[in-house]
Amino acid sequence: YVPAKKGYSNVINREENRGAIPPSQGYILVDIRKCQGCTSCMLACTLVHEGVENPSLSRIQIIQNPFESFPDDVTIEQCRQCVDPACVSVCPTDALRANAGYGNVRMIDRTKCIGCGDCIEACPYTPSRPVAVSDEKFNDDLKVRKCDLCADTPYHWDDAGGGPEGKQACVEVCPVDAIKFTTKIPVQEGDEGYKVNLRGTNWRRLGYPIG
C-alpha cells in the first residue's frame, strides 16, 4: 500500500492530542499456540462488517509462514486499541476517533476518511493494524478499516453484554477458543499483554478470560 497523498502528517501535526484520548474499555487477546490458521475469524469479521466473506477486507489478520516451526508458523495480528493511539492522533480529518458511544473503541468514520494513509504509517506494529482497501460503497476510493470490536454490528459489546452472548464475531466463531475479549487494559509492551496463554491460571487470577 502506498498512501494516496503523501505529506498530510507533515502538514497537520496532531501531537497535542496524544495523552488526551480516553482508553478503550475493550481489548482482544489471542493465544497463538491455540490458533490453527483456519481464518474463520477473518471470514466472520468481513461478513458482519461488509456482508461478504472476503479475507482482504478483514480487520483481524492471520499470518502463516510455512518455513517457521510451531508456534511461530501461525500468528494472529489484531488491533491493540492502544492506550496512546498514534493512529487517532495523526488523522487529519478526525475520521479515526475514540467513540464514546462504544466504550471509546478506536473507530473509523469512512465518510470522513480520505485514504491518506497517515494512520497506517503511524501504527507502531507490522503489519499495520489499519488497512486501506478500495471501497465500492465510495466509488472504489481508498478507505481505511481497522478492528472496532464489532461496534455498530449485531456482535457489538456494551454494558448489557452486546451481541450473542456478548461476543465479538471473531470470538464467537473461533473453533479452538484462541481469541478472547477483556475489559482490562493489557500490558502495553510489545506482544506481552496481547498474545497470551489463555489456559494459564495466572491470567485467571488477574481476571482475564481464559478458555
Please report, for each region that a protein language model flagged, where it lies by residue.
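Flanking helices and flexible, charged tails adjoining ferredoxin-like Fe-S electron-transfer domains
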Residues: V2-P23, L57-S58, I63-Q81, V90-T93, ...
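Membrane-helix exit/interface motif
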Residues: A95-A98
